[in-house]
A protein has these predicted regions:
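ABC-type ATPase nucleotide-binding domains, specifically the catalytic core motifs of the NBD
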Residues: 61, 101-118, 130
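Conserved ABC transporter NBD signature motif
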Residues: 65-76
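Helix-to-loop junction immediately C-terminal to a conserved catalytic motif
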Residues: 57
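Conserved ABC ATPase "signature" region
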Residues: 115-136, 188
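Conserved ABC ATPase signature
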Residues: 140-144, 148
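The feature captures the beta-strand-to-loop junction immediately N-terminal to the Walker
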Residues: 42-44
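A short, proline-enriched helix->beta-strand linker immediately N-terminal to the Walker B motif
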Residues: 159-163
Length: 306
């Protein structure tokens, strides 16, 4: 079963651990993501959401385990993975257009930049048009609203043509009205470009509204390793839900179905409702995981596949 899932996957994560000293942050993470998915990731504060994102980006490497992008091991950060943070990654003294061109300027050899000057300029303008900033090319960051700055940051990533766009709480610093408009903008952009997006957020409403799939990461769970508190446990994927991919509008947040899903995810994060590893809510068709024998004691088994 795992081989067939692996063949369908753009991003493949298997038996991944991240340990700092004696602290286990990520504990045997298994994840498969296919091209074109918009995956949202939620979980309690400090559970390792941003750590997982840094591993995919290549800023850090797993202590153990395998991570593949299009079948190749993930190495140091490169243009195959774009990143947008909560803090705007803009150069203050460059225009909007100059900021978007900065990535190619820093990554390409001088002669290639010179040869492709018009092509790169056209590409920068194209992506700024995609993020609705075609009329703001000559403005500087201090002249832009928070939402506009984040759209510039997204265009900075897009011009590098990443296979996957990673977003770490990108709308967290925006006011509620701007945040909502940016959510709608991101959905339009995702549908237009067919991008693969991995979106980390602490906001359950945002995660359910945006995602085609929502993953819950948590270190609050039960297994067969003894009493909690006596065994160092890191975070696992405790839930993996497929979400509706029908046309979304702000009105979708007002439906009973939306509210029920929010409540279901909220209960999964709530430490008062810990689940045993064998009962994790892994509903997505690409969900899979392996467990060590000490986590779930099955006679004669060293791994448990589901």
């Amino acid at each position: 079963m795992n081989d067939s899932i692996k063949e369908k996957s753009m991003l493949w994560i298997e038996d991944v651990y991240k340990i700092y000293g004696n602290k286990v942050v990520l504990d045997d993470i298994d994840l498969a993501v296919s091209a074109g998915e918009l995956v949202t990731v939620v979980g309690p504060s400090g559970c390792g959401k941003s750590t997982l994102l840094r591993l995919i980006l290549g800023q850090e490497f797993p202590t153990r385990g395998s991570m593949l992008l299009d079948g190749k091991p993930i190495g140091f950060a490169d243009p195959t993975r774009g990143i947008v943070y909560q803090r705007y990654s803009l150069f203050r003294h460059r225009t909007v257009l100059g900021n978007v061109l900065e990535g190619p300027r820093l990554s390409l050899p001088f002669m290639e930049r010179r040869r492709r000057k018009k092509e790169l300029l056209d590409e920068a303008k194209h992506f700024l048009e995609k993020v609705n900033l075609a009329s703001d090319l000559d403005k500087y960051p201090h002249e832009l609203s928070g939402g506009m700055r984040q759209r510039v940051a997204i265009a900075q990533s897009l011009i590098m043509k990443p296979k996957i766009l990673l977003m770490d709480e990108p709308f967290g610093a925006l006011d509620p009205s701007t945040r909502q408009s940016m959510q709608l903008f991101l959905l339009e952009l995702w549908e237009d470009l067919g991008m693969t997006i991995f979106f980390v957020t602490h906001d359950l409403h945002e995660a359910v509204f945006l995602g085609t799939r929502i993953i819950v990461l948590s270190h609050q769970y039960l297994d067969d390793r003894g009493e909690y508190g006596h065994v160092e446990r890191g975070a696992k994927i405790i839930a993996d839900h497929p979400l509706s991919v029908t046309a979304k509008s702000v009105d979708a947040k007002k439906t009973a179905e939306f509210g029920e899903l929010i409540e279901e995810v909220r209960l999964e994060i709530d430490i008062r409702h810990k689940k045993h590893v064998k009962d994790f809510n892994l509903k997505h068709p690409l969900s899979w995981r392996t467990l060590r024998e000490e986590e779930h004691r099955l006679t004669g088994a060293t791994k448990y596949d589901s």
